[in-house]
């Protein structure tokens, strides 16, 4: 399973929100580039960036910061937030971003998602952010009547590369991921699902690892990495590629039970 550190950018700084509430913001670092370098140095194989300002206004805001991160690290980067038209997505991918994450546009203009998938195969991910099972849009400020599973099925048919599922009520709370919702979503679609929201411990990651065989292939971790609840190195050893439980017993005992 791929452990993906999250870097949320608001006003040029690295922050975390509580349940997606912009009024409940905690600043963790004034320089997101330094944060990206840290996670890369600690063994991250991919980074998850969100331009929170762009998610609200629907157009890029922290583009210079994102460009600086791309130049600073040599690992794949996925970026979301405010990607609602062709030129924005195309310019972002042209910078060297591996995958663009679409949110609001998946609800409002699914035909545009189809167009993106045809033009940029393998590079389009849809982020499904759910509140009580229904999809939230526009930086989580609005909630639609569309069920998360229904949207996932529709997006899978359009051939998006993966689905990122976030339970908004869990996001930033360290209360653990919504395992049942993830199980339902992963069972419904045949494309990879990436878990996000509430992950607080190695045990949470091990619970997600149990869903890997049905399609949960990654976990985005935010607040727990910043508060020290999860060590990226230990997380990779526990559930990442070449994890300890995959090592033959005769090569030594694991520190993880």
From Swiss-Prot:
Keywords (A to Z) from UniProt: Amino-acid biosynthesis, Cytoplasm, Histidine biosynthesis, Isomerase
PANTHER family cross-referenced by the UniProt entry: 1-(5-PHOSPHORIBOSYL)-5-[(5-PHOSPHORIBOSYLAMINO)METHYLIDENEAMINO] IMIDAZOLE-4-CARBOXAMIDE ISOMERASE (PTHR43090:SF2)
Primary location class: cytoplasm
Top EC category: isomerase
A GO term from the CC aspect: cytoplasm
Annotated pathway: Amino-acid biosynthesis; L-histidine biosynthesis; L-histidine from 5-phospho-alpha-D-ribose 1-diphosphate: step 4/9
Matches recorded under SUPFAM superfamilies: Ribulose-phoshate binding barrel (SSF51366)
Residues of the active site: 8, 129
Catalysed reactions listed for this entry: 1-(5-phospho-beta-D-ribosyl)-5-[(5-phospho-beta-D-ribosylamino)methylideneamino]imidazole-4-carboxamide = 5-[(5-phospho-1-deoxy-D-ribulos-1-ylimino)methylamino]-1-(5-phospho-beta-D-ribosyl)imidazole-4-carboxamide
Enzyme Commission number(s) from the entry: 5.3.1.16
Compartments (UniProt record): Cytoplasm
GO BP: any one term: L-histidine biosynthetic process
Protein family membership: Belongs to the HisA/HisF family.
Gene3D superfamilies named in the record: Aldolase class I
Protein name (database record): 1-(5-phosphoribosyl)-5-[(5-phosphoribosylamino)methylideneamino] imidazole-4-carboxamide isomerase
InterPro entries in the cross-refs: Aldolase_TIM, His_biosynth, HisA_bact_arch, Isoase_HisA-like, Isoase_HisA-like_bact, RibuloseP-bd_barrel
CDD domains documented for this protein: HisA (cd04732)
Entry superkingdom: Bacteria
Lineage: Bacteria, Bacillati, Cyanobacteriota, Cyanophyceae, Oscillatoriophycideae
GO molecular function: 1-(5-phosphoribosyl)-5-[(5-phosphoribosylamino)methylideneamino]imidazole-4-carboxamide isomerase activity
Designated gene of the protein: hisA
